[in-house]
């Protein structure tokens, strides 16, 4: 009994005297004989008669290939005048794929063995959703609680009270310090780096920053001040929009930030799609880039690439 090619099917000749044929209905893999692809994909029924029939015993469906013997290495195909076709065929050891369609594998062992381009692990039966506890860019909740306790002690010491109204005012002063002096880990404070309360008390930036750093000591955070204050992002934005916080316009100008984007470009705020629109996100990114560029130029004037000359013009 002979096997005949059909339109709409995908075939591949496997080198075994060009008699063994692989059959599928998808577009993955490579064809060893370009004429098969041409005639079956783009040809007519009449053109199929130009391809010799193959004995049925040498035809293998895609599913059977997984258990078939290992195929010998293919010989380099002879050069042909016609343009090379796009790689289309079938994926061994997997279900047949159709163009632009994923195959979902329920067995994780099979998925890990295959790791195919068009294969996804089937998660339909999983009801648990991973919960992110500690977000990147922030200190952990546990460390934040330690810092909160330390700042409460500082509040009582500096403000002379720790009632709710006093705590609220104190944290407004803490945020104002961040807006005025920013939160770079390399900042060195001077004796006049402080802000005054309504009743004339002085709150020094170094007090606040050292309090946070000491509470987060030995936790491994690169910049605990910035990563702690990131929790105050919504408060920073709303307080700035409502005129409760005053920006350091000199630094904002150095970073190239227009006034309407001041609330979104304080260096300790963390972008969130709940509070940032696309323009605010762009402004935040551009401010970061400019700040990094300024820091790099200040730290090292060595010319590493001629394109750096363009940035200096």
Swiss-Prot record:
Family: Belongs to the closteroviridae capsid protein family.
Localization per record: Virion
Main location: virion
General function of this protein: Capsid protein self-assembles to form filamentous capsids, about 1400-2200 nm in length.
Keywords carried by this UniProt record: Capsid protein, Helical capsid protein, Virion
InterPro entries: Closter_coat (IPR002679)
Superkingdom of this protein's organism: Viruses
GO terms under cellular component: helical viral capsid
Annotated protein name in UniProt: Capsid protein
């Amino acid at each position: 009994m002979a096997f005949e090619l059909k339109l709409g099917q995908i075939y591949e000749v496997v080198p075994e005297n060009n008699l063994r044929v692989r059959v599928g209905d998808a577009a993955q893999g490579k064809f060893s004989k370009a004429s098969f692809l041409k005639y079956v994909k783009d040809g007519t029924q009449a053109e199929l008669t130009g391809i010799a029939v193959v004995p049925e015993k040498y035809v293998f469906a895609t599913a059977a290939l997984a258990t078939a013997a290992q195929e010998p290495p293919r010989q380099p195909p002879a050069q042909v005048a016609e343009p090379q076709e796009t790689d289309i065929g079938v994926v061994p050891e997997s279900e047949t794929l159709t163009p632009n369609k994923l195959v979902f594998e329920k067995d994780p062992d099979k998925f890990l063995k295959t790791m195919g381009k068009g294969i996804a692990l089937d998660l339909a039966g999983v009801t648990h959703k991973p919960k992110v506890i500690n977000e990147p860019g922030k200190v952990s909740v546990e460390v934040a609680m330690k810092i909160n306790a330390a700042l409460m002690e500082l509040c009582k010491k500096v403000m002379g009270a720790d009632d709710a109204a006093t705590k609220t005012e104190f944290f407004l002063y803490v945020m104002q310090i961040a807006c005025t002096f920013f939160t770079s880990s390399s900042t060195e404070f001077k004796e006049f780096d402080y802000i005054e309360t309504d009743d004339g008390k002085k709150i020094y930036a170094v007090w606040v920053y050292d309090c946070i750093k000491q509470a987060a000591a030995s936790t491994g955070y690169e910049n605990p001040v910035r990563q702690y204050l990131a929790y105050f992002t919504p408060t920073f934005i709303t307080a700035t929009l409502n005129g409760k916080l005053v920006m350091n316009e000199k630094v904002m100008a150095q970073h190239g930030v227009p006034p309407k984007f001041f609330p979104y470009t304080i260096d300790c705020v963390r972008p969130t799609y709940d509070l940032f629109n696309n323009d605010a996100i762009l402004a935040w990114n551009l401010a970061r880039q400019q700040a990094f560029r300024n820091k790099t130029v200040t730290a090292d004037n060595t010319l590493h690439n001629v394109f750096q000359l363009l940035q200096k013009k």
